[in-house]
Each structure stands twice: as structure tokens, then as C-alpha cells.
């Protein structure tokens, strides 16, 4: 009886591992179908009780694996741009731009996961698939991200994604009008406007 229990436990482990591997493979292969795109997005942030904290909107341009431009236009403008080596964050309101090396950027934020689509990033999560929904939970518990969900079609179109933090704050993003194809290279360059304070952390 004990041997049977051990065998069942081992079998369950193998099946779970296989399901996880299939989910990772499915998610990565779907995202790989679209190498570059533009989409508009809406954002809704709620706190642990479900009360609205912020709503916003903007535009997103991506060319995988390392080029992207995340432009929040409302309620306050902010820009996150990667030229493949440097990651720029610009806040026009405070007139400050921060530069960091992309290779040093954290891979445990939802947007970075989507933009990079690297196997090494996905390995850090337990992933479950339910149709077009993929639910990710970090294997390590020392980060701020509690759960990440992305809905991506078989054709690689991202419909929505959301992130739940440890304090249960939820940020949900709805993508609309995704247009696949070449993106103007200028979208992936950033030159700080004159007079802007630059915090260069590329040391």
C-alpha cells in the first residue's frame, strides 16, 4: 500500500510537471507568433477591497525581444522606452528621465514578461492554462507580485493582462486594436528633452 501511495505521488508529480511544461510552451509559442505590434490600452487599478484607485489609458509598441515603448497618456503622462540596451523612464510632469541597463531590469513585472518573452523569465513561475488564459504565480515569495494573468489568443493577439500584488492591489489592462507588423524604429529611441533632469543609473 505504501509503495502504491509513493507511485501515485510520483505519477502526480510527473503529470503536474508535464502540464506546467505544456502551459509554458503554449504561452511562449503564442507570443512568438507576433514579433512586433502596436495596441492601445486601458488601465484599471483597484485596491484589496475592490475600490477603484486609478483609471488610465495609453499606447503600446513592441518589437520582441527587447524593443518596446509603453506610453501612458492618461491620467498622467509617462513613458517607458527600451532601445534594446537602455531602459528609459520619463515623467514629463516632474521633468525627470531615468536610464538603466535593460539587462539589469527586473523580469518579474508583467510588462517585461510580455515584451521579452524569454524562457528564462517563464521558468520563474508556475503556469496554468485555461483556454486562452494563462495564470502565473511566482515560485519565489520574496517579490511584490502575487499573481499574473494574461489572455492571449492562438494567433498571438494579447487581449488583456492583470497583476495582483501581495497587498491584493490589482492592475488590469485591456488591449484594443492590436495591429501586427512593422513598427517605426523611432518608437524605440528616446532623447531626453532639453532641461530635463537625468538620473543615469548605468554604472
Curated annotation (Swiss-Prot):
This is Outer-membrane lipoprotein carrier protein. Belongs to the LolA family. Pfam families: LolA (PF03548). The gene is lolA. Its main location: periplasm. Participates in the translocation of lipoproteins from the inner membrane to the outer membrane. Only forms a complex with a lipoprotein if the residue after the N-terminal Cys is not an aspartate (The Asp acts as a targeting signal to indicate that the lipoprotein should stay in the inner membrane). It comes from Salmonella paratyphi A (strain ATCC 9150 / SARB42). Monomer. Residues 178-203 are annotated as: Disordered. GO terms for biological process: lipoprotein localization to outer membrane; lipoprotein transport. It is found in: Periplasm. Gene3D superfamilies: Lipoprotein localisation LolA/LolB/LppX. Residues 1-21 form the signal peptide. The keyword Chaperone applies.
